[in-house]
């Protein structure tokens, strides 16, 4: 009897031990003995089975908003995400720009992936699912549509195609990126419910081999995504036309459409078009419902869409039991040099996206709730359905940030670009001498400026012509800018695509043999991000510079990416009262002194009195400013400021007169 009891006791201990082993979760949070999360399409509806929320199967209406993590400082993510959740959203959508995570060349290690993963985890912790758009093409009014600059080093190359060179680069990138995302799929306990294949490809081409290659790669690393709860749901996004939907159609990929506010009859028509190539009923979904629009430098005014119009369109969409993603819900900023551009004709059109990506979104660039936010919230609350396994009460809305008008502060020091060339050339990028000026890409440079330098002679023609200019050039004769006779105090510049030639005046201080120095400061104003002209290399292209009918040369090429590292090397500072070189590209320095942490808040630098250039705050490249408008201020987050002295640096490229002061306001201004 004792033996039988002992045997049963040992069996019980062994069984209990086995059960404890089975209780250990897999990577990604899945319990090996529990049913996994699932998200799939059935009978024209999204169905979700969320084990972390009771495990019941429910219809799911996606109410999503776009938030690009790369347009917002990480310290501010939780605030923006929480405000999105508090508005009633259950999902967010974001791109993953290739140039953010693999900026340094083909087959190189990825960077900033921890930031991406942290962003996705924060979204999940706040209760938001994620629609992911991993590229390889993004658009997004972002530099080169998200492609890294080095992809253009290979010429010719066909982007967004089955071109073997392009595909090999995609494979090298995705083979590193996608495995990092797999544990974060909804079926693995993460927040990712949908993954987009390419981006609005129907507006671009019909290379099915390319799309099939992308889908095969996604399935290899993220699962088959069969639409029945296995893996992740793959989808595409296109405008509501049969032609566009045909261009991106792939077997097993759920097709969605995108459009802005319009009458409900047109919305219904668009959702009918969405079903054109569907083999079974699918949920109607607008995956880019436009809450605002793009603004470009030189526009008469910033793009605006009335809050009531946006809210009515959203109400109509949700009333049809359709799902929606609002593009954008929070826009953010194009920090550094990362704004995109558009061109529908290389010879007549080049539009540059402004530094602010406010987009007239429900959350402003500084993260403030707006009239549009509350109009949208009122609509969403009509459609939030309480369930037995979730609390439909929305969280409280976080307060808006403190805004401070620091007023006018004095410029204290200045120094010329030309006195700092050796300091500013990146240690990995040396000055090169070539027969003709070479593009940025051949200098292994992504963004910023290039200075081209050569020698001319007074015997040569004074008519200078640049054969192909991308994008903006300022001419210096013996280190002095050619002044604009129409706009006093500004330098003459050549601007793509409007003008590429100039009549120069010979200087009086030439050498004995008649030689003088010619310098051209070239600015990359943002690579094209959409359309047929994506192969947008930067610099002086196609032969270089003509004096009359003669090509000039040889040339010294100085790459000037103006990174945080190179910026710290600036020296030869002079007191502003003694500075006499303001008709050259100039760095200006000022100090914003904050006595305590209570003094720190968001602020806005006014462009008043400035020309065109770049703003740096404590070494951080905040972005471009330009007096053509309609953007008139540049947002500076309190995250960039600290107690004590804060260094403000302007790199001014347009004005030929010195700058003596700058002004900080407590609100943004747009024309």
Swiss-Prot record:
Q: Which positions carry the signal peptide feature in this UniProt record?
A: 1-18
**GO BP of this protein:** galactose catabolic process
Spell out the subcellular localization from the entry. Answer: Lysosome
Instruction: Give the UniProt entry's GO cellular component terms.
Output: lysosome; vacuole
- InterPro entries this protein is in? B-gal_1-like (IPR026283), BetaGal1-like_ABD1 (IPR048912), BetaGal_gal-bd (IPR048913), Galactose-bd-like_sf (IPR008979), Gly_Hdrlase_35_cat (IPR031330), Glyco_hydro_35_CS (IPR019801), Glycoside_Hdrlase_35 (IPR001944), Glycoside_hydrolase_SF (IPR017853)
What family is this protein classified in?
Belongs to the glycosyl hydrolase 35 family.
Q: What is this protein called?
A: Beta-galactosidase 1
The organism is Dictyostelium discoideum
Q: Which gene encodes it?
A: glb1
């Amino acid at each position: 009897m004792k033996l039988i009891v002992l045997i049963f006791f040992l069996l019980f201990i062994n069984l209990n031990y086995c059960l404890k082993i089975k209780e250990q979760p897999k990577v990604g949070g899945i319990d090996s003995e529990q049913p996994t999360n699932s998200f799939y399409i059935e009978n024209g509806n999204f169905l979700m089975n969320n084990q972390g929320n009771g495990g019941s199967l429910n219809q799911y209406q996606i109410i999503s908003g776009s938030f690009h993590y790369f347009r917002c400082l990480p310290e501010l993510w939780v605030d923006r995400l929480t405000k999105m959740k508090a508005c009633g959203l259950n999902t967010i959508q974001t791109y993953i720009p290739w140039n953010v995570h693999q900026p340094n060349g083909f087959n190189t290690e990825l960077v900033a992936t921890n930031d991406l993963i942290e962003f996705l985890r924060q979204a999940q912790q706040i209760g938001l699912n994620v629609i992911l758009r991993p590229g390889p093409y993004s658009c997004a009014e972002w530099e080169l549509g998200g492609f890294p600059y080095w992809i253009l080093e290979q010429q010719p190359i066909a982007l967004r195609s089955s071109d073997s060179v392009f595909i090999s680069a995609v494979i090298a990138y995705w083979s590193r990126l996608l495995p990092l995302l797999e544990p974060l799929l909804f079926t693995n306990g993460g927040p990712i419910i949908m993954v987009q294949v390419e981006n609005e490809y129907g507006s671009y081409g019909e290379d099915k081999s390319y799309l099939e290659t992308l889908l095969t790669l996604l399935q290899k690393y993220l699962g088959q995504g069969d639409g029945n709860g296995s893996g992740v749901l793959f989808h595409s996004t296109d405008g509501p036309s049969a032609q566009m939907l045909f261009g991106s159609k792939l077997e097993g990929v759920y097709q969605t459409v995108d459009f802005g506010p319009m009458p409900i009859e047109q919305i219904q028509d668009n959702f009918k078009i969405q079903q054109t190539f569907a083999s079974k009923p699918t949920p109607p979904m607008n995956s880019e419902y436009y809450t605002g629009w793009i603004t470009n430098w030189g526009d008469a005014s910033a793009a605006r869409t009335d809050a009531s119009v946006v809210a009515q369109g959203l109400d109509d969409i949700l009333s049809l039991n359709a799902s929606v993603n609002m593009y954008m819900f929070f826009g953010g900023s194009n920090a550094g040099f990362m704004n995109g551009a558009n061109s529908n004709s290389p010879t007549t059109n080049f539009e540059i996206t402004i530094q602010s990506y406010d987009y007239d979104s429900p959350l402003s660039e500084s993260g403030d709730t707006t009239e549009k936010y509350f109009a949208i919230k009122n609509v969403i609350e009509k459609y939030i359905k309480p369930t037995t396994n979730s609390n439909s009460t929305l969280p409280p809305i976080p307060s808006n940030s403190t805004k401070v008008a620091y007023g006018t502060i004095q410029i204290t020091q200045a120094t010329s670009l030309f006195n700092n060339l050796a300091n500013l050339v990146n240690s990995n990028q040396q000055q090169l001498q070539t027969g003709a000026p070479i593009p940025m890409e051949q200098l292994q440079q992504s963004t910023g400026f290039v200075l081209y330098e050569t020698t001319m002679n007074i015997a040569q023609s004074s008519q200078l012509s640049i054969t192909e200019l991308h994008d903006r050039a300022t001419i210096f004769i013996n280190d002095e800018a050619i002044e604009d006779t129409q706009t006093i105090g500004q330098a003459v510049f050549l601007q793509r695509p409007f003008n590429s030639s100039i009549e120069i005046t010979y200087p009086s201080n030439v050498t004995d043999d008649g030689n003088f120095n010619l310098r051209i400061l070239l600015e990359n104003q943002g690579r094209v991000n959409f359309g047929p002209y994506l192969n947008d290399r930067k610099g002086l292209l196609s032969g270089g510079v003509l004096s009359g009918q003669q090509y000039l040369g040889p040339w010294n090429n100085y790459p000037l990416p103006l990174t945080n590292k190179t910026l710290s090397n600036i020296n030869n500072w002079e007191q502003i009262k003694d500075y006499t070189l303001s008709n050259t590209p100039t760095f200006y320095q000022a100090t914003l002194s904050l006595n305590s942490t209570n003094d720190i808040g968001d602020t806005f630098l006014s462009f008043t009195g400035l020309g065109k250039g770049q703003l740096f705050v404590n070494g951080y490249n905040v972005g471009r400013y330009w007096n053509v408008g309609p953007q008139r201020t540049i947002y500076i987050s309190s995250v960039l400021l600290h107690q004590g002295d804060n260094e403000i640096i302007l790199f001014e490229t347009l004005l030929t007169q010195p700058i003596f002061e700058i002004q900080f306001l407590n609100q943004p201004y747009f024309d």
